[in-house]
Amino acid sequence: MVEDYFSEQVKKYYKDRHVIYGRCAHLTESKPIFVEQGRGMCMSRRICQRGCPLGGYFNSNSTLIPWALKTGNMTLKPNSVVHSVLYDETEQKAVGVRVIDSETKSSQDFFAKVVFVTAATLNTNLILLNSTSKRFPNGLGNDNGLLGKYIAFHNYRATINAEYEGFPQFTTEGAKPTSHYIPRFRNVYKQETDFLRGYAAGFGARPARDTNREGIGEELKSNLLKTKETGLWSVNSHMMGETIPKKSNKVTLDTEKKDKWGIPQLSIDVDYDDNDEKMIQDFFEQFSEMYTKAGFKNIRINDNKRRPGNDIHEMGGVRMGNDSQTSLLNKWNQLHECKNVFVTDGAYL
C-alpha cells in the first residue's frame, strides 16, 4: 500500500525516476519444465538465506546442479577444494584442475579439454593467481600483470528512514520475496553530477506497532497481543552504489599465510574513494527530497561507514577486452593467452 503510494508520488514529481516491484528469480507457479528439474514453487517461508530445499528460487544448488546430474554427463565431487588450473607447457594449454580433498587433504588431478573457472569473483582470482607454471609464473594468463586488479563492488553504506501517517486502517499480510526498487536515475543519458556512474535503491514499508515487550513466556505473549492498533508506517531505503573498477583496488596472494589446505590466502586491498563519498551525499539529498515530497516525516539519514567486503556483488580482477595488453579475457570470456580456459562469473568485469 505505502509502496504503491510512494511510486505514485515519485511518478508525479519526477520524470526520470521509477519505483517498481523488485525483480527476483523465484517460481510463483509450477510448469512441466520446473517439475522435470525437481523444483517446487516458492512457499513464502521468508528464510531464503538458508537455501531453498524446494528450489523455489533460482540458484546453483537447487537448479543447475540437479539439472546437470540428470543428463548423466556430470560427476559431482564433494569435499573438493580447487587448488589450481593445470597448464601443460608442451601442449600450451590448460589440461585440467588440481583439487585438495577437504577431509583427507590429499590432492587429485582431473583432466579436461576445456576448463571453466566460475568460483565467485574473489575465489576465481585466487585460483588463477595460484595457477602458476614456467609459462605463467605470476598466474594463468597473467602476462600483463593485471590479474587481480580492477576489483569493484557495490556500496551499501547509506540508508534513509522515515515515518508516514497515512493508511492507518491498513497493515501487512503474508510474505513477499523482495522489496520495491528504484533503478538508477543519475548519469543515465548524460553526465549530470560531479561523480561518475550512479546508484539504485530499495524501498520498503511496514506498520510500526508500539508493543510492550516485557516479561517472558506467556506474559510476553500476552503483552505483545495487547496492542491491536498499528502505529505510523516505517519507511526506509538503502543505496546500492556503483564503485569504479580501479587498478589500485586489487587482490593478491599472501606470501606467508596459507589456509588449512595449503593454499595461499587472498590479500584484499580495496577502499572507497571521493567518487563514492559524493555518491552517498547525493543519495541523501535526492531521497530526502523524494521522501519530503511524498509527505514522509521524521526523516533520518545514516552512513554506517562499514568497510568494503561487508556487502555483496564483488566483481572484476579478470578484465575483459579486445587488447591483451590491457585485459585478460576476450569477448567470449576466454583467456587471451590460454584460450581453453573460460571465466564466466563476476570476475570478468
What are the functions of these language-model segments?
Residues I20-R23, R45, H83-L86, L232-T243, ...:
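A glycine-rich dinucleotide-binding beta-alpha-beta segment and adjacent secondary-structure elements
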Residues M1-V82, P308-N310:
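Conserved redox-cofactor binding core of oxidoreductases
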Residues L27-I33, H83-L86, S106, N123-L126, ...:
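Flexible loop/turn segments at secondary-structure boundaries
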Residues P66-K70, S102-D109, M320, T326-H336:
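A short acidic-Thr-Gly-centered motif at the start of a beta-strand
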Residues V35-E36, D88-V95, D311-G316:
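A short, glycine/Asx- and small/polar-enriched loop/turn
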Residues Y5, Q9, Y13, W67, ...:
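Generic, well-ordered alpha-helical scaffold segments in large soluble proteins
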